[in-house]
Regions:
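A metal-dependent, Asp-based hydrolase signature
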Residues: 26, 37-40, 50-87
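Substrate-recognition/cap helix-loop segment adjacent to the acidic, metal-dependent catalytic center
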Residues: 103-113, 117-141
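Asp-based, Mg2+/Mn2+-dependent phosphohydrolase catalytic module
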Residues: 1-9, 128-164, 168-230
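Generic enzyme active-site microenvironment
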Residues: 13-15, 115, 164-165
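Active-site neighborhood of HAD-like aspartate-dependent phosphohydrolases
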Residues: 2-48, 72
Length: 230
């Protein structure tokens, strides 16, 4: 990558879950499948393990939770069915409306990159099966805690300005504290984190708030850059 190439001076960093992909619907589909496949009690046990693991790791690990569930249920023949459901889930059907249009808009304005948290198997699978890997032309970064890896992001995608699009205000705040006026934070109000008014109120207001990811298309590069200086 040529560090002086003007097309890379503005880099758009897109989150995946509840930013491009409706992950709440994915979780709801998994919940229904678990109840149908292993029953209400075992499904509840899976989600208890899932929440415990998320607390330990700092990200959602659906397959990791299934692995731990397997330790307690080593002879459950339904586990393979649940695994197939997860691995073969049609993530492309859960892309938010106009999410790809928003990505294409960003690509016209600069460089578009996926910047996500997650495990090293299921999250890449989600990015691939949703079609996002191809739409972003392979420009995908997945970390354990992405807000702690901004130096690596800069090394891989040097830019004079960054645009961070994420449904979690906590992460937008952390990135803004690190990059300051070099980043414009964009908050799509999608998903349960974004719609939790009490949670959102704990943090400073992002530079730009949009009701849906497709609304990013309404902003010119000049408007996006200017918003960082408010």
């Amino acid at each position: 990558m040529n560090r002086t190439d003007a097309s890379f001076r503005t880099v758009f960093l897109f989150d995946v879950d509840n930013t491009l992909v409706d992950n709440d619907r994915v979780a709801a589909d998994l919940q229904r499948h678990l109840r149908k496949t292993v029953g209400e009690t075992c499904a509840r046990h899976y989600w208890e393990i899932f929440e415990q693991l998320r607390s330990e790791l700092g990200y959602a690990d659906y397959l990791g939770a299934l692995q731990r569930y397997r330790v307690d249920h080593p002879r459950d023949p339904k586990l393979l069915e649940v695994s197939y459901f997860m691995v073969n889930y049609p993530f492309a059907n859960r892309l938010f409306p106009e999410s790809l249009d928003a990505v294409a808009h960003a690509q016209r304005l600069g460089q578009a990159v996926i910047l996500s948290d997650g495990d090293v198997v299921f999250q890449p699978r989600k990015v691939d099966r949703s079609g996002l890997y191809d739409d972003f032309e392979g420009h995908v970064l997945i970390y354990v805690h992405k807000e702690l890896q901004l130096a690596d992001v800069e090394e891989k995608y040097p830019a004079s300005h960054y645009v961070m699009i994420d449904d979690k205000v906590r992460l937008l705040t952390a990135v803004k504290q690190h990059w300051g006026a070099r980043v414009t934070t964009v908050f799509p109000r999608q998903g349960h984190y974004a719609l939790d008014a009490a949670l959102v109120a704990q943090y400073p207001q992002p530079d730009i708030t949009i009701e849906r990811i497709g609304d990013l298309q309404k902003y010119s590069l000049e408007q996006i850059l200017a918003a960082a200086l408010k």
